[in-house]
Amino acid sequence: MKLSLTTPKGALVDTDVEEVTAPGDLGELGVLPGHVPLMTALRPGVLSYKAKDHDGIVAVGQGFLQVAPLPRAADAPARDRVLVLVDQALAAADIDREAAARELAQADKELAAWRGELDGAYHALVLRRGWAQARLDAVARAPGAAH
């Protein structure tokens, strides 16, 4: 399978993979070769993938995931493409754990004190909290992380 993970700033991952796990809106979603075509919403969380020579851990924001067959020549084997479009993403190795922890604590404090409507501002705060938690979770799941 071909995994392409893109943000508005550009491509973060573009590699052949054997497996992808992503944070779907309804729960964690696993994709293996031959998966049925689908499109689903993603929530902030951890996307992981297994390639032949390495594994990857990426914190992702909200977005979409699509699984579809790649175009191919008549004599070529079938391959799938996993396209991930998210508003933000960071490889686990590039995450500042302390900054994410501070942002999570601040978002939790603001949510606990929230007395306003459950409107766009509230939704933005929930997403900010989710992004901070996603980064902390990615760091915790990265190889060599202290547990």
What is each residue range found by the language model?
Residues 1-2:
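Absolute protein N-terminus
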Residues 75-78, 83, 89-147:
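Acidic/glycine-rich phosphate/pyrophosphate-binding loops and surrounding catalytic core
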Residues 6-106:
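Compact, glycine-rich, soluble single-domain proteins
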